[in-house]
Design a protein with these regions (language model features):
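Bacterial Sec-exported substrate-binding components of ABC uptake systems
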Residues: 2-67, 170-198, 259-270, 293-296, ...
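Short helix-initiation/N-cap motifs at beta->coil->alpha
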Residues: 47-50, 103-111, 233-241
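Extracytoplasmic substrate-binding proteins
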Residues: 138-203, 301-320
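Proline-aspartate-enriched helix->loop->beta-strand connector
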Residues: 118-124, 140, 246, 250-255
Length: 320
């Protein structure tokens, strides 16, 4: 069995941001230069739970606990505003932020460090949502959790609205047009993959994702055919499966995330986990249609402006 591995270092949202700006001003020395939007502006942000956050001016000191948002902020040229990020699993593509304040991990925030960063905006996602009130005690907080039912459309909306927050609309318009074209092209070819399984390897165990799940957009929005429809989507880490399950479903195509590799955890590589008689009996294995996707992009970053095109490219390239 030959397994293809992608490692693309290029590298939403349940939050829809509604923005209104008024007033004018000049950027402070050393602050990001947001030429497209006044520095003193009232920004009303409607977040995931339907509530609103009002920013009195364009953010100048931002703590970002969501790597997808950090990826987008970097891509639009607003990175100078970032003062703190989780450092432990910071992707290689975002190492330019390694000297900002370490605010803990994606799941365990160092709230003292966040406060010391003196942010005027905090950006979080689903991993930190339970602690939103704690963040709000420090600074205005935006929850940009992914809408899994409309992942691609909501990701594009999030990109557009983050650009508006930082006055960088001109930096994203062409890229978003290219992204939409990429989506349409993939939709037109996805059926070539045949019955498809999307699998995660973690700690030597396997789980799978179907329509309506965290990674269900490949089926629901891009048109890949699910090899299994009996999958429970209650757990964000997928439904645990066995090698026998894979052999029974006999996918023609498999996409695999190596979670351990993505988070820097030691353990058996996904290729080793999958290299057995049952998996090798599948059509996907026989036709070299098992692809190890870039785990960092898929598991940690996912919907950023740089990352999302990379995810789509991995899917497209697997069909060649």
């Amino acid at each position: 069995m030959r397994i293809r591995r992608f490692s693309l270092l290029a590298t939403v949202a349940a939050a829809t941001l509604t923005l209104t700006a008024c007033g004018a001003g000049s950027a402070e020395p050393g602050a990001s230069n947001n030429a497209d939007t006044p520095q003193n502006a009232d920004l009303t942000v409607q977040v995931a739970d339907g509530s609103e956050v009002t920013l009195e001016e364009t953010p100048q000191r931002v703590v970002v606990l969501d790597y997808a948002s950090l990826d987008t902020i970097d891509a639009i040229g607003a990175g100078e505003s970032v003062v703190g990020v989780p450092q432990k699993t910071l992707p290689e593509s975002l190492q330019q932020y390694k000297d900002t304040i370490d605010v803990g991990t994606l799941k365990e925030t160092d709230f003292e460090a966040v406060a010391e960063a003196d942010p005027d905006l905090i950006i979080i996602s689903a991993r930190q949502a339970d602690n939103q009130k704690k963040f709000e005690e420090i600074a205005p907080t935006i929850n940009l959790a992914t809408d899994t039912e409309h992942f691609i459309d909501s990701s594009i909306t999030r990109i557009e609205d983050l650009a508006a927050v930082f006055g960088k609309q001109d930096a994203v318009s062409d890229k978003i047009d290219a992204l939409k074209t990429q989506v349409d092209e993939l939709k037109s070819t996805a059926e070539k993959a045949g019955p498809t399984l999307f699998v995660m390897s973690s700690g030597g165990k396997l789980s799978t994702y179907g329509p309506g799940s965290r990674y269900g957009f490949i089926f629901d929005e891009l048109g890949f055919t699910p090899a299994a429809t009996d999958i429970s989507n209650d757990d964000g880490h997928g439904q645990e499966i066995s090698f026998e399950y894979i052999a029974e479903k006999n996918p023609e195509t498999m996409f695999v995330i190596d979670r351990d590799a993505a988070i820097g955890k030691s353990g058996k590589a996904a290729e080793q986990v999958l290299d057995n008689k049952l998996v090798n009996s599948t059509t996907a294995a026989k036709n070299d249609r098992i692809t190890i996707v870039d785990g960092v992009n898929w598991y940690l970053v996912t919907g950023g402006l740089n990352t999302l095109p990379s995810l789509l490219s991995e899917l497209s390239d697997s069909l060649k």
